[in-house]
Amino acid sequence: MSEHGVVLDPTSLRFTRTLPASVETVWAFLTESDKRGRWLATGDMELREGGGVTLRFVHADLSSVKEPTPEPYKPYENGVTTHGVITRCEPPRLLAFTWGGSQGVPSEVTFELTPQGEGTLLVLTHRKLNSRNDMVDVAGGWHTHLGVLSARLAGRDPGPFWSAHRGWEADYQARILGA
């Protein structure tokens, strides 16, 4: 199984990962602010359909390795917050919510969790992306963040965030054809 995101259509990407933790543990890392903040973003989630989602990203907090913020992300160096609404919530198996989105139009992220041996199969689908640029940005971001999640669940330090992100973003720039 490739760890690369797969383009499903001109507006959708899917990532599949086998994670080294139980479904319940992975669910906690998706839904509990303190755990989610170790790999993605802190913030409140009302775990019900129609519930609010707040995600506060501070990428410098995701790694013990300090490195400069790349120029395109300098405006968000001290953090950025996005808001969404939960569209589906079936603990501990499925979580979907709207995601900020460029041009004021929200996209939608869905996490599906399935037990797999002693671990969990995670399927992450990000839909309703507005452009190829959004798709490349989201693909590089999710690939990097999922790497951090996997490392955290395995009890490892994830390594430098921005260096990994730069590499994955360049990789997806070459992989994702014009939409």
PLM feature spans:
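Hydrophobic ligand-binding cavity/cleft-lining segments
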Residues: 1-52
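Short beta-edge strand/loop motif at the mouth of beta-sheet-based domains
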Residues: 33-79, 161-167
